[in-house]
Design a protein with these regions (language model features):
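Basic, short loop/linker segments at the boundary and entry of helix-turn-helix/winged-helix-like folds
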Residues: 1-54, 72-76, 101
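DNA-recognition alpha helix
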Residues: 60-73
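Short, basic alpha-helical nucleic acid-contact segments in DNA-binding proteins
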Residues: 74, 82-101
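Active-site beta-loop-alpha junctions of metal-dependent nucleic acid enzymes
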Residues: 85-86, 136-160
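Two-metal-ion RNase H-like nuclease active-site motif
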Residues: 101-115, 124-126
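Helix-centered, glycine/charged polyanion-binding patches within enzymatic domains
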Residues: 171, 175-234
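C-terminal domain-tail junction helix/linker
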Residues: 229-288
């Protein structure tokens, strides 16, 4: 029996990524043209704006109306947006500095938003036990590069001897990105990856790690609730700014029932402050 010469050929694809450090930088808000210390309104007004616009997910125009009709404070909706953008620049540094250690298992996913009518994607990672957001990154695609950026930040504060497992869906960008990250460690550290596929547990791995995937899905729903009033964004910086402020609110201000009504990252400096606006202004003072 004559056999074809190609019968036993094995075909496979191999990809090797070569990213420069400047290509793996987190998305961050632009530095504001006006310092918050020089604004015409008081710190309390700034705190109220962030309380309504971010913590309570009130649109910018309605936030301005509440301040005018309830507190007799005259600000425009553009002032609300400008103050939020200015605060986000400080809060981004605050988020990174005070993230702290991470759990052994983190879950990640991406969700879409619209900027100028086009889809963009926000990558999130959340710690399994303390439920804090360990990474956030905005990109115009769901490829390997933004996945690497988000995962690099997610594991940045891990201890040297920690065994890290990242749980994601079936997006091939994540295993490709983990392959790149592990190659940078030269075998000194190995990041493990677990996939949760679909809505039903059709394999043992999906069944075992489904609960971790549900953490990130709930986070995505909470994020969508907070950005929905914006009805899309007119610029990338606006999207990055609101995402950054959402992370500050989620990690440091928002009480979680499963954490005994404490935020994921409790801070002594915020504990005894009675109002949300006071906590916002305290965060900004700590970040300055």
């Amino acid at each position: 029996m004559k056999k074809k010469s190609s019968q036993f050929k094995i075909n496979y694809q191999y990809r090797e990524y070569h990213y420069k450090p400047e290509e793996l930088e987190l998305s961050s808000p632009d530095k504001p043209p006006v310092e918050l210390a020089k604004i015409h309104n008081s710190e309390n007004v700034l705190g109220l704006i962030l309380t309504f616009y971010v913590s309570f997910a009130v649109p910018a125009r309605k936030t301005a109306q509440i301040l005018r009709d309830v507190f007799c404070i005259k600000v425009s909706h553009q002032t609300v947006l400008n103050y939020a953008a200015g605060a986000a620049w400080y809060c981004h540094r605050f988020n990174l500095k005070h993230k702290g250690l991470i759990d052994d298992i983190s879950a990640g996913d991406e969700t879409y938003i619209k900027i100028l009518g086009k889809h963009h994607f926000v990558f999130f990672f959340i710690s399994a036990k303390n439920l804090k957001i360990t990474a956030y990154h905005l990109a115009d695609n769901r490829g390997t590069q933004p996945a690497v950026i988000a995962m690099n930040e997610a594991i940045r504060t891990a201890s040297d001897d920690q065994k890290i497992t990242l749980v994601t869906d079936g997006n091939p960008s994540y295993p490709a990105g983990i392959h790149f990250i592990n190659a940078q460690f030269d075998g000194a550290t190995t990041i493990h990856h677990k996939k949760v596929i679909g809505l039903q547990n059709l394999d043992a791995e999906s069944e075992e790690y489904r609960s971790f995937k549900q953490h990130i899905e709930r986070l995505n729903r909470t994020y969508k609730y907070h950005v929905r009033p914006a009805a899309g964004f007119n610029c990338t910086n606006g999207a990055v700014s609101l995402t950054t402020l959402f992370v500050t609110h989620y990690n440091f201000l928002r009480p979680h029932m499963s954490l005994q009504h404490q935020p994921p990252i409790p801070m002594l400096e915020l504990k005894n402050l009675p109002t949300i606006q006071a906590r916002w202004t305290k965060i900004l003072s700590l970040a300055a």
